[in-house]
Swiss-Prot record:
Gene3D superfamilies: Ribosome maturation factor RimP, C-terminal domain (2.30.30.180), RimP-like superfamily, N-terminal (3.30.300.70). Required for maturation of 30S ribosomal subunits. Its main location: cytoplasm. Keywords: Cytoplasm, Ribosome biogenesis. The lineage of its organism: Bacteria, Bacillati, Bacillota, Bacilli, Lactobacillales. GO terms for cellular component: cytosol. This is Ribosome maturation factor RimP. It is found in: Cytoplasm.
């Protein structure tokens, strides 16, 4: 599957560069009996449906013209924004999320917990620091970034 992701990344990058869009993520996943190629794009002020359709059309043309076909099985192509709970994958994503409410999942539990949500109050190459509430107390905890399995923006309720 990684070769599909790499191929699609290489095909879509010039389209995005030409339109000043950013590639957030590419996924090629099987759900039930169907395969989905998902391309998440964004730009500083947010992406709209027409821009997603433009990228979808251009990427579809490029994929159809490849020989041999990089994706031999049938699949659904979806191009969309990363949504309100966008994943944090690149360094730039983490920098933009500073002072925002985020969700992190750890590879291994710390203090019996693998999932944390809070405001990221500090960030450097090795660690990030979250501030969150435990009942009536505000807690600040620093996490090694190499111990974080996934991170994303979160909506605070």
């Amino acid at each position: 599957m990684s070769s599909v992701v790499e191929t699609v990344t290489n095909l879509v990058t010039p389209i995005l560069d030409e339109n000043h869009f950013e590639l957030v993520d590419v996924e090629f996943v099987k759900e039930g009996k169907s395969w989905y190629l998902r391309v998440y794009i964004d730009k500083p002020n947010g992406i709209n449906i027409e821009e997603c359709a433009l990228v979808s059309d251009k990427l579809s043309e490029k994929l159809d013209s490849c020989d041999p076909d990089p994706i031999p099985q049938a699949y659904y192509l979806e191009v969309s924004s990363p949504g309100a709970e966008r994943p944090l994958k690149k360094e730039k994503d983490y920098e933009r999320a500073l002072n925002k409410y985020i969700h992190i999942s750890l590879y291994q539990a710390i203090d019996g917990q693998k999932v944390y949500e809070g405001t990221m109050v500090d960030l450097n190459k090795e660690t990030l620091t979250l501030e969150y509430r435990v009942k009536t107390r505000t807690v600040t905890k620093t996490f090694d970034r190499n111990k974080i399995a996934k991170a994303r923006l979160a909506i605070k309720f």
